[in-house]
Amino acid sequence: MSILPSFGFTQEQVACVCEVLQQGGNLERLGRFLWSLPACDHLHKNESVLKAKAVVAFHRGNFRELYKILESYQFSTHNHPKMQQLWLKAHYVEAEKLRGRPLGAVGKYRVRRKFPLPRTIWDGEETSYCFKEKSRSVLREWYTHNPYPSPREKRELAEATGLTTTQVSNWFKNRRQRDRAAEAKERENGENNGVGGKQSQRSPLDGVKSLMSSSEDEFSPPQSPEHSSVLLLQGTMNNPAAPAYPMPGLGAPHPLHGMQGHPHQIQDSLLGSLTSSLVDLGS
């Protein structure tokens, strides 16, 4: 433990002052203290001093200096969470200033993808939704055996994963909700498939027939005299023996002796008679 020349403090004492000022939130005073340190490479490479410099740089909005510090020194694992927080928050602030609006969850995700954590403050293990994959594996394994852990089990899981009890509780709650939603969707799809199978057994013409009949009933235009005559003709053709209804101006229909059983001859005779009658009406 050697006293730094022309300063009066040891390196350990300087590191202790940096830690105390950080924990107390006295960042302006911490900045002045760092500025007063002598130009000693050994001192300025101390991890507590570098961490204090990073905190002050973020506090003052000097993000370029912050990134330089975080990328140039291999920080200890126990300091990774704090340094990662500074890295991400700084990039979030820059992105919000550039876009002119706060970032949502998707925006923050894109920033993290664009500016991944440097290996100096990251152990290289993939994280998902802020949980390390190792922690998620422990939670998934427990969930398969018991989706409803007791408070004591949640505390034990929190210790095993490095998470808080609240984080563990929220993870199980969200997982149960996702599973229930997936089961409900599967049931809905199964019911829809069953209904579709029953409908497919019906004739595809059933719906068309009902649609055509309803459309004809609702939208039929008023019948003209010519249309009425055609309907009369059709009825006579369907039942040649039935007498035709008398129409004003029309004579009695011609007898059809000897023509039964010959639809084409009956049709030609009726058409000729009807045409003559219509011509007489028009004259």
Swiss-Prot record:
It comes from the Eukaryota. GO terms for molecular function: DNA-binding transcription factor activity, RNA polymerase II-specific; RNA polymerase II cis-regulatory region sequence-specific DNA binding. Pfam families: Homeobox_KN (PF05920), SIX1_SD (PF16878). Disruption phenotype: Morpholino knockdown of the protein disrupts both skeletal muscle development in the trunk and cranial muscle development. Disrupts myogenesis by interfering with the proliferation of dermomyotomal cells expressing pax7. Residues 124-183 bind DNA. GO terms for biological process: apoptotic process; regulation of inner ear receptor cell differentiation; regulation of skeletal muscle cell proliferation; regulation of transcription by RNA polymerase II; skeletal muscle fiber development. Keywords: Activator, Apoptosis, Cytoplasm, Developmental protein, DNA-binding, Homeobox, Nucleus, Repressor, Transcription, Transcription regulation. GO terms for cellular component: cytoplasm; nucleus; transcription regulator complex. Residues 168-264 are annotated as: Disordered. InterPro entries: HD (IPR001356), Homeobox_CS (IPR017970), Homeodomain-like_sf (IPR009057), KN_HD (IPR008422), SIX1_SD (IPR031701). It is found in: Nucleus; Cytoplasm. Residues 179-190 have a biased composition (Basic and acidic residues). Residues 237-248 have a biased composition (Low complexity). Its main location: nucleus. Belongs to the SIX/Sine oculis homeobox family. Transcription factor that is involved in the regulation of cell proliferation, apoptosis and embryonic development. Depending on context, functions as a transcriptional repressor or activator. Plays an important role in the development of the inner ear, where it promotes hair cell proliferation and inhibits proliferation of neural progenitor cells. Required for normal myogenesis. Plays a role in the development of fast muscle fibers throughout the body, as well as the development of craniofacial muscles. This is Homeobox protein six1a. It comes from Danio rerio (Zebrafish). The gene is six1a.
